[in-house]
Each structure stands twice: as C-alpha cells, then as structure tokens.
C-alpha cells in the first residue's frame, strides 16, 4: 500500500490514503458471556479497592 496518491497529471498527493471501511461482526453468545464475567470481576475488584481505601483512611486517624 502506498502512502501517497497521484492525481491525473501525475503529481503526488501526500494526503492520507483512507482505509477500507467494513462493518464489525456482532459479538457471539460466548463473547457476551465473557464480557459479563469480566464486568463482574471488575466490579468486585473496584469494590474491594474502595473498601480497602475506606478501612485504611479510618485506621490512620
């Protein structure tokens, strides 16, 4: 793939070449399940971090 184009007179055009656009595939049932599992793990981790922060801030006073 060239990083340039030429016009009808043969002059170089240094503008970016636009990539071909395509539609993404819809996520499968397995993908959706994996996203749900990752979201649940993330919620648990963030809740744990917040709990540790609350306990640590209360313990220092």
UniProtKB/Swiss-Prot annotation:
Disruption phenotype: Normal growth, photosystem ratio and O(2) evolution under all tested light regimes. Greatly increased levels of HliA and HliB are detected in monomeric PSII in normal light (40 umol photons/m(2)/s). High levels of HliA and HliB are visible at all times during growth in high light (500 umol photons/m(2)/s). A double hliA-psb34 deletion has high levels of HliB even at 24 hours, grows very poorly under intermittant light (5 minutes 500 umol photons/m(2)/s and 5 minutes dark for 8 days).
Induction (UniProt): Expressed under normal light (40 umol photons/m(2)/s); less is made under high light (500 umol photons/m(2)/s), which disappears after 2 hours (at protein level).
Transmembrane segments: 36-56
Keywords: Membrane, Photosynthesis, Photosystem II, Thylakoid, Transmembrane, Transmembrane helix
Keyword Signal in record: no
Membrane-topology descriptor: Single-pass membrane protein
GO CC terms in record: photosystem II; plasma membrane-derived thylakoid membrane
Keyword Transmembrane helix carried by entry: yes
Cited InterPro entries: Psb34-like
Domain of life: Bacteria
A GO biological-process term: photosystem II assembly
Subcellular location: Cellular thylakoid membrane
Role according to the record: Involved in photosystem II (PSII) assembly and/or repair. Probably involved in conversion of late PSII assembly intermediates into mature dimeric PSII, it may mediate the optimal equlibrium of HliA/HliB among the intermediates containing CP47 (psbB) to facilitate photoprotection during assembly.
Assigned protein family: Belongs to the Psb34 family.
Annotated NCBIfam families: harvest_ssl1498
Subunit and partners: Part of the photosystem II (PSII) assembly intermediate RC47 complex (with D1, D2, CP47, PsbE, PsbF, PsbH, Psb27 and Psb28); minor amounts are found in other PSII complexes, including mature, dimeric PSII with PsbO and PsbV. No HliA or HliB are detected in any of these complexes. Its interaction with PSII requires both CP47 (psbB) and PsbH. HliA/HliB and Psb34 probably bind to a similar site on CP47; their binding seems to be mutually exclusive.
Name of the protein this chain belongs to: Photosystem II assembly protein Psb34
Annotated gene: psb34
């Amino acid at each position: 793939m060239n990083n340039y184009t030429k016009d009808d007179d043969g002059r170089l055009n240094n503008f970016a070449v636009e990539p071909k656009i395509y539609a993404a595939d819809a996520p499968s049932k397995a993908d959706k399940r994996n996203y749900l599992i990752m979201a649940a793990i993330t919620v648990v981790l963030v809740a744990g971090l917040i709990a540790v922060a609350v306990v640590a801030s209360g313990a220092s006073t």
